């Protein structure tokens, strides 16, 4: 896992979901572990898109349930660029 991407994702998650930094682990599920509802998830995806200058289609966003999944998706998109 790219540590730089993870740290940026972690920072965004902490800010968007107002959770403690130590609760944001690669395995953390946005809904179950971090308390995100559907609106939080949409806002989180938008923040990730802005930070990493990528587009996350709705179908892809539905499959990003954990911090690790977000990092993996961003790594994949950046590799295409």
UniProtKB/Swiss-Prot annotation:
Pfam families: PP-binding (PF00550). The gene is acpP. Belongs to the acyl carrier protein (ACP) family. This is Acyl carrier protein. The modification O-(pantetheine 4'-phosphoryl)serine is found at residue 38. Carrier of the growing fatty acid chain in fatty acid biosynthesis. It is found in: Cytoplasm. One of its GO terms (biological process) is lipid A biosynthetic process. Keywords: Cytoplasm, Fatty acid biosynthesis, Fatty acid metabolism, Lipid biosynthesis, Lipid metabolism, Phosphopantetheine, Phosphoprotein. InterPro entries: ACP, ACP-like_sf, PP-bd_ACP, Ppantetheine_attach_site. It comes from Crocosphaera subtropica (strain ATCC 51142 / BH68).
